[in-house]
């Protein structure tokens, strides 16, 4: 089966049964929270034999708890081929191509500035309560424990469409430049289950996150969600993801298409206004969603907002200069 621990951190920790052990897909933001999530699972299932850890993408809330999930000494040798890594009996760590490069770029090169700004965005230092910190739309908030990183032992590229991990087949879909520069969805045929990483989240996401990061490509984001729908929807019973809750059955197709549609709409409408000569601030004030998207509860503006996403698209194509020489 597939099990998720939600509410322990900003993201979910997902535990997937293999023939003789477990895959952990995303390991939360900090070591302590991941230890607690793993302990919850072990209280129910006994000691977990972790065959593989998968990082869905290069944001810290998905890899920072690595040392709470596994011991560094139990990690497979990255110099070995992937087949030999699995055969070694050690834990294999998988991530999308470019993961380490972008994890370092975001969390080392700009890490100090970004961490400071994240405190403002998420209200990390606020007291919990109705007049302080509640949640942040995609999860409970930013945790403040020990952030760790264990480098992937193998990065998934386009030349690796699928792997079998301890008897469980996993089919990958790379989605670079969407919610993160390096990201991947995954499909589990045995469970008829589609993992959408952070490409679908039960809320409108950020095309530009206010903590600071590279602007995301709304057009590609929509494209990859539609591709996932076309490749996997007809053989999927459940869609699950790294934030918020799963979706089942007949609602899956609509869920994927509505999520793709909102990013495509914001992208195209912003370009339309840009080419008419409006500035970034003017577009942010003008743009509005059609009723069909406005009324969809899982694409509401609980995390990202329409105005700052429109500004993100303007920035991506035209940059900060408003072309006013005065």
Describe the function of each predicted region:
Residues 1, 16, 26, 41, ...:
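Divalent metal-coordination and catalytic microenvironments
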Residues 2-48, 184-188, 192-198:
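Conserved beta-strand hairpin/beta-sheet module of binuclear metal-dependent hydrolase folds
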Residues 20-21, 32-92:
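Active-site metal-binding motif and surrounding structural segment of the metallo-beta-lactamase
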Residues 25-27, 51-61, 94-97, 175, ...:
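Active-site neighborhood of phospho(di)ester-bond hydrolases with catalytic His/Asp-centered motifs
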Residues 58-64, 100-103, 179-181, 201-205, ...:
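Active-site environment of divalent metal-dependent phosphoester hydrolases
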Residues 87-90, 94, 98-176, 220-229:
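Metallo-beta-lactamase
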Residues 169, 173-227, 231:
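Active-site-proximal loop/helix segments of hydrolase catalytic cores
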Residues 193-194, 203, 219-282, 286-290, ...:
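Divalent-metal (often Zn2+) His-rich catalytic cores of metallo-beta-lactamase-fold enzymes
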């Amino acid at each position: 089966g597939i099990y998720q621990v939600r509410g322990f951190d900003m993201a979910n920790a997902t535990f997937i049964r293999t023939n003789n052990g477990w895959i952990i897909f995303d390991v939360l933001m900090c070591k302590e929270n991941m230890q607690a999530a793993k302990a919850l699972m072990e209280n129910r299932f006994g000691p977990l034999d972790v065959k593989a850890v998968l990082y869905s993408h290069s944001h810290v809330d998905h890899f920072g708890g690595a040392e709470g999930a596994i011991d560094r000494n139990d990690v497979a040798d990255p110099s070995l081929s992937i087949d030999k890594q699995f055969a070694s009996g050690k834990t294999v760590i998988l991530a999308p191509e470019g993961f380490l490069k972008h994890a370092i770029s975001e969390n080392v090169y700009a890490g100090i500035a970004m961490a400071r700004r994240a405190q403002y965005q998420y209200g990390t230092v606020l007291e919990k309560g109705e007049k302080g910190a509640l949640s942040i739309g995609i999860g409970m908030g930013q945790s403040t424990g020990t952030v760790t990183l264990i480098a992937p032992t193998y990065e998934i590229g386009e030349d690796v469409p699928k792997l079998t991990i301890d008897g469980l087949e996993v089919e990958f879909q790379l989605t670079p430049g969407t919610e993160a520069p390096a990201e991947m969805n995954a499909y589990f045929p045995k469970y008829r289950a589609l993992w959408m990483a952070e490409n679908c989240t039960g809320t409108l996401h950020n095309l530009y996150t206010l903590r600071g990061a590279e602007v995301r490509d709304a057009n590609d984001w929509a494209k990859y969600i539609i591709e996932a729908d076309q490749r996997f929807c007809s053989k999927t019973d459940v869609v699950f993801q790294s934030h918020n809750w799963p979706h089942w059955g007949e609602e899956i197709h609509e869920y994927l298409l509505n999520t793709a549609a909102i990013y495509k709409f914001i992208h195209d409408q912003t370009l339309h206004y840009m080419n008419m000569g409006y500035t970034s601030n003017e577009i942010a004030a003008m743009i509005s969603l059609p009723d069909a998207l406005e009324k969809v509860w899982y694409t509401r503006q609980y995390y990202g907002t329409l105005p700052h996403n429109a500004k993100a698209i303007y920035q991506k194509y035209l940059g900060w200069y408003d072309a006013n020489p005065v």
